């Protein structure tokens, strides 16, 4: 009986030109996948960078609580079609629920309370401290090693954060707010807990997408319970199409689409390079605030922002492990 599979292998190996052609096709496909991966990660970073901008627009008609709830309801609608059947044990469900509580209602309510007080530019630059906070958290709680470059990046990011906060002024329109900046930074520490706990589940064999999506769904349920108990039903009538577009974009683009793009992209590109696209968020977010919302950045803020972004670039371009799945 003929064996087509084996015959094909012999035919290819017996003809160097065919073997070389097959190798060229494989290399071309890998190259295309890699560039598509870079594009997906970059687009995810761009979508994340617009989150504060859309939030400021929504605050014209919605409270912080109702905006965050609407954001995640739209995000859940955008991710429902990829929900996998959960395979968590009872213990893992408890771990996931703790992470979801920190990552969705706590982190995002604190973060957007901060945005309500400060400017888009300041909030975006504060988010730029996340790679450094994550590196320190992984060193402290997960036993990872932070080298000399990492500690220098930590020092630079801390100095930049201090410069931005110290340069805020309540008397200058568009100049930021100290309490708002601090709340955004505090939200990053809740995000740290969320990420580190999720990493435990991923190390136990669960995919980043499964952990991310189920964490988002359960976190949204917790968020809804809190918001409805504290603030009642969100408004539907009289909101205005401009606000609805901002809210929908915040959920569908900044959370659902960015999550899908990032989780696909990081599996197509070298792990040491994917993380650099996280730095699009603070840089582009600050530009959006200045150019579209009239934020005013003093010299201290410009210098501080440059230090934060430089520190994040140093960490993400020298990082050796693969960036984990993220949700924004």
Placement of each model-derived feature along the sequence:
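Specific transmembrane alpha-helical segments of multi-pass solute transporters/efflux pumps
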Residues: 46-52, 80-127, 137, 163, ...
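Hydrophobic/aromatic residues within transmembrane alpha-helices
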Residues: 58, 67, 71, 114, ...
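Specific alpha-helical transmembrane segments that line the substrate/conduction pathway
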Residues: 66-77, 103, 108, 112-154, ...
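Hydrophobic transmembrane alpha-helices of multi-pass small-molecule transport proteins
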Residues: 79, 146-168, 188, 223, ...
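Small-residue-rich packing faces within the transmembrane alpha-helices of Major Facilitator Superfamily
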Residues: 49, 73-77, 158, 192, ...
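Helix-helix packing/entry segments at the starts of transmembrane helices
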Residues: 68-70, 123-129, 197-220, 251-291
């Amino acid at each position: 009986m003929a064996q087509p599979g084996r015959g094909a292998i012999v035919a290819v190996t017996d003809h160097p030109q065919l073997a070389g052609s097959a190798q060229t096709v494989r290399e071309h496909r890998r190259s295309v996948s890699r560039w598509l991966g870079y594009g997906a990660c970059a687009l995810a970073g761009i979508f994340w960078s617009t989150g504060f901008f859309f939030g400021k627009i929504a605050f014209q008609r919605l409270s912080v609580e109702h905006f965050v709830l609407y954001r995640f309801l739209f995000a859940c609608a955008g991710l429902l079609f990829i929900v996998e059947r959960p395979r968590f044990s009872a213990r893992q469900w408890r771990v996931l629920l703790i992470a979801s509580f920190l990552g969705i209602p706590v982190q995002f309510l604190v973060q957007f309370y901060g945005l309500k007080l400060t400017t888009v530019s300041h909030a975006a630059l504060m988010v730029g401290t996340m790679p450094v906070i994550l590196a320190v958290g992984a060193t402290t709680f997960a036993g990872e090693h932070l080298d000399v470059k990492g500690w220098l990046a930590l020092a630079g990011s801390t100095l930049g954060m201090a410069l931005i906060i110290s340069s805020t002024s309540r008397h200058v329109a568009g100049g930021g707010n100290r309490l708002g900046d601090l709340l955004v930074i505090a939200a990053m520490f809740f995000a740290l807990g969320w990420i580190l706990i999720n990493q435990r589940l991923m190390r136990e064999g669960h995919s980043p997408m499964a952990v991310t999506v189920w964490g988002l769904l359960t976190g949204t349920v917790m968020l809804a319970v809190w918001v409805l108990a504290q603030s009642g039903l969100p408004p539907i009538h009289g909101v205005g199409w401009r606000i609805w577009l901002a809210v929908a974009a915040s959920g569908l683009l900044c959370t659902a689409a960015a999550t899908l793009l990032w989780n696909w992209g990081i599996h197509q590109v070298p792990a040491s390079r994917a993380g650099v696209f996280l730095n699009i968020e603070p840089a582009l977010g600050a530009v959006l605030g200045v150019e579209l919302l009239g934020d005013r950045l003093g010299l201290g803020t410009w210098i501080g922002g440059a230090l934060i972004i430089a520190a994040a670039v140093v960490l993400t371009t020298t990082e050796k492990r693969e960036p984990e799945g993220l949700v924004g």
